[in-house]
Amino acid sequence: MGRAEKVVLAYSGGVDTSVCIPYLMHEWGVKEVITLAADLGQGEELGPIKQKALNSGAVVSLVEDGREEFITDYAFPAIKANALYENRYPLATALARPLIAKMLVRAAEKYGADAVAHGCTAKGNDQVRFDLGILAQNPEIKVLAPAREWGMSREEAITYGEQYGLTFPVKKSSPFSIDKNLLGRSIEAGPLEDPMCEPPEEVFEMVKAISDTPDEPEYLEIGFEKGVPVMVNGEALGPVALISKLNEIVGNHGIGRIDMIENRVVGIKSREIYESPAMCVLVDAHRDLESLTLTADVTQYKRGMEQTYSELIYRGLWFSPLKQAVDAFIEQTQERVTGVVRLKLHKGTARIVGRRSEKSIYTPDLATYGADDKFNHESAEGFIYIWGLPTRVWAQANK
């Protein structure tokens, strides 16, 4: 008896998920493998994926469009939270996993599958994100993870797949692992495992090299409504179109590359290369607009919550009670975050040069040092006396 009768496999067309199809059938005795490829903006690589899965042994190959849901229900909440894992990574890959988990469970219930599967390895973060995301949707369903158990290196997995007629777009001598969606690309493995190895230019796709960027700067205006980006340069755009346009504009100026050593969920450090042009400028612009529209105490408290939020996403806890509670807090803070932020893009930098909002609590006649100054200067001395009282008492007690 096999591990399961019918399995829905999260399928990307890459090495691990492709090898999972024959492995599930020949090694684990699964009778039917249904593949599900979530279209989250991968682009051309999704073209042949349906037939590739069928050629690899799948009985049904599904490609489902999740782009709108991905941006609206996952990316936009992350932007509201200014979510950057370890203050750098805008979580492009991590945000996709809970949605894919949700889609897997939907497909399993539709097709009567008794298990779902993924191709994540035992060292990665995605195994945690998929397993927890799946179990949050259906705690009774089996979760199979062949790559966590088969013990094959990437080169051995390629050889195994080739025995069953599979072909791969990577070379055994330099097998980069690449994940792509609308929010960005992640690149790892191969020579990049040496943290001193500079990434070769050919691994980048979304963000131009500085030497290839325009010599003249470009100004970019992003409009927000209640924390959600809705306009680019005065043009109202839907979620998918907005992210796509920003990726193109920002990436053209060499903005959005990230090279970092990050701390994985399983306790190891890994070297990761990311491209995420739209998300990088959206988080920066959104944070700046908050500085114009939120009070100091709310802003300060929210910054701590943002770190928690980022860690929850990274660690696979999207559907957790704490994540839901933090969501409620962040949503409340966004009622006033409406306005426009202006950025200057040039040679790898996105510098914020202006912002405006009808909800602004910046008051020019209180901030000015000119003749229009309405700040009550006489109140400063009394304020300092009260504010400094604990310091003065402490100093006297410690003479």
UniProtKB/Swiss-Prot annotation:
What residues does L-citrulline bind to? 89, 125, 129, 177, 186, 262, 274
Pathway listed for it? Answer: Amino-acid biosynthesis; L-arginine biosynthesis; L-arginine from L-ornithine and carbamoyl phosphate: step 2/3
Chief subcellular site? Answer: cytoplasm
- Give this protein's Gene Ontology molecular function annotations: argininosuccinate synthase activity; ATP binding
Q: Which SUPFAM superfamilies match?
A: Adenine nucleotide alpha hydrolases-like, Argininosuccinate synthetase, C-terminal domain
Q: Which residues bind ATP?
A: 10-18, 38, 119
Any Pfam family matching the protein: Arginosuc_syn_C
Q: Which residues form the signal peptide?
A: none
- Give the UniProt subcellular location, in the record's own words: Cytoplasm
One GO cellular component, as annotated: cytoplasm
- What's an example Gene Ontology biological process for this entry? urea cycle
Q: Which residues bind L-aspartate?
A: 121, 125-126
Q: Cross-referenced Gene3D superfamilies, in alphabetical order?
A: Argininosuccinate synthetase, chain A, domain 2, HUPs, Single helix bin
Which InterPro entries does its entry note? Answer: Arginosuc_syn_C, Arginosuc_syn_N, Arginosuc_synth, Arginosuc_synth_CS, Arginosuc_synth_type_1_subfam, AS_cat/multimer_dom_body, Rossmann-like_a/b/a_fold
Enzyme class name: ligase
The reaction(s) catalysed by this protein are: L-citrulline + L-aspartate + ATP = 2-(N(omega)-L-arginino)succinate + AMP + diphosphate + H(+)
Q: Which UniProt keywords apply?
A: Amino-acid biosynthesis, Arginine biosynthesis, ATP-binding, Cytoplasm, Ligase, Nucleotide-binding
Domain of life of the organism encoding this protein: Bacteria
Q: Which Enzyme Commission number(s) are on file for it?
A: 6.3.4.5
Q: Which PANTHER family match?
A: ARGININOSUCCINATE SYNTHASE
Family, according to the entry, reads as follows: Belongs to the argininosuccinate synthase family. Type 1 subfamily.
Subunit text: Homotetramer.
Write down what this protein is called: Argininosuccinate synthase
The record lists the organism as Picosynechococcus sp. (strain ATCC 27264 / PCC 7002 / PR-6) (Agmenellum quadruplicatum)
